Design a protein with these regions (language model features):
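C-terminal substrate/ligand-recognition segments
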Residues: 2-16, 148-154
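Structural motif
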Residues: 17-22, 63-69, 107-114
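Short, solvent-exposed loop/turn segments that connect beta-strands within catalytic domains
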Residues: 63-64, 74, 167-170
């Protein structure tokens, strides 16, 4: 994304081993890392010119989450715009004055809300209480997160669904799927719809 005055642009790069945001000054070629830490930027949504900041989504609070965040063009402090936890999927107005956020968690259907540029919720647009009640009525089992540690000490996230009336003293058959590819987080704190 180019800065409107033509002085530079922002991009994401894995230069430090994590996907982070950098600004580049066109005249000097100087690069400034705007975000840093042991987490990945998922997407750059654009530049909020009025507030001189970059709006983006990232797995900052937890690798299973997707947060909506902002960072000033000078890189001084990341601001949380969405509620913590779960998966937040924003749609921004022109100029980034408002955004509609669709947020869900592993066992909670999407809730759609309207927020101002500082992240304050202005209005609840859709709460999906009817869907949540219907799911509860069917008595479906809930998903649970777990973490495995490999022989190399790497922690891997997973989720499981146990049979109804699960008894830990019993043995059950297991159906397992896995993904071994790079750069794709398949274990998300997000409503799964058909997987519920």
């Amino acid at each position: 994304y180019f800065i409107k005055d033509g002085s530079g642009f922002v991009l994401s790069s894995e230069r430090d081993g994590w996907n982070h945001i950098y600004s580049v000054n066109i005249a000097s070629g100087k690069q400034l890392q705007l975000t840093r830490g042991g987490w990945d930027v998922i997407a750059v949504n654009g530049i909020d010119e009025a507030n001189q900041r970059v709006i983006f989504t990232a797995a900052k609070s937890d690798p299973k989450n997707q947060d909506v965040l902002a960072v000033p063009l000078n890189g001084k402090g990341v601001m949380q715009l969405s509620p913590l936890g779960g998966t937040n999927d924003p749609e921004f107005s022109t100029g980034f004055r408002y955004f509609i956020n669709t947020r869900s968690t592993l066992n909670t259907p999407p809730v759609i809300t309207l927020h101002n540029s500082k992240g304050k919720q202005i209005k609840l647009l859709k709460d999906n209480t009817k869907l949540a009640a219907t799911v509860k009525e069917y008595g479906l089992v809930t998903k649970e997160f777990f973490t495995l540690t490999t022989d190399q000490g790497i922690e891997l996230n997973g989720w499981m669904m146990k049979p109804p009336a699960f008894d830990s003293r019993q043995k059950y058959p297991v159906f397992m799927t896995q993904y071994s590819g790079p750069n794709s987080n398949e274990v998300l704190d997000q409503w799964g719809g058909r997987d519920q």
